[in-house]
């Protein structure tokens, strides 16, 4: 029987999909808090940098996958880009829709979608973005294959995800902080230690930068690049469909 990782546990694919769904239903209303806890607030700067690298244009249609709360999409929309926000979790989408209304942000389409089996036709998007979402997908390679399928020829793929830093001193410090402090923050502020513990564990089980780059290549992308941040604690991956 196939097993996939859920944090440090190995579970069936169906169980992981269900468990991850539960995690994000619980954290949806406090998603910014979760990201602040895991990044020390730096995720806001990283996302700004990420969108600058995408170089969105007003004439483009971009798919922001696992983007339910709108963090990336709102930044893309500032360029006049048409953005489709897709997320498997309806609770995350509801948070994003409310935030968009409050900010009077337009040019957005909201879709409940599974990254491994998108409902879109082939060759329809100019760019595909996914930030801090792909490590929660049950079958990462399937999601990458789908990203390639729905992109136009000449389309760009951008993924930002936590990884493992190569700065040894910082690595030890962050591991201590993430393992012992972040779950307690989750318990204190959200009464949800388990969800925050899973999110930290999922980082350690995610492929390293080199292996994930190989997976992007296997999906069919070329000109693959990885831009490490803080020694690789976070990396921005990119590739092109030709």
UniProtKB/Swiss-Prot annotation:
EC class (word): transferase
Xref: Pfam families: Ubie_methyltran (PF01209)
Annotated S-adenosyl-L-methionine binding sites: 69, 87, 114-115
Protein name per UniProt: Ubiquinone/menaquinone biosynthesis C-methyltransferase UbiE
E.C. numbers: 2.1.1.163, 2.1.1.201
Name of encoding gene: ubiE
Species of origin: Zymomonas mobilis subsp. mobilis (strain ATCC 31821 / ZM4 / CP4)
Keywords: Menaquinone biosynthesis, Methyltransferase, S-adenosyl-L-methionine, Transferase, Ubiquinone biosynthesis
Alphabetized GO MF terms: 2-methoxy-6-polyprenyl-1,4-benzoquinol methyltransferase activity; demethylmenaquinone methyltransferase activity
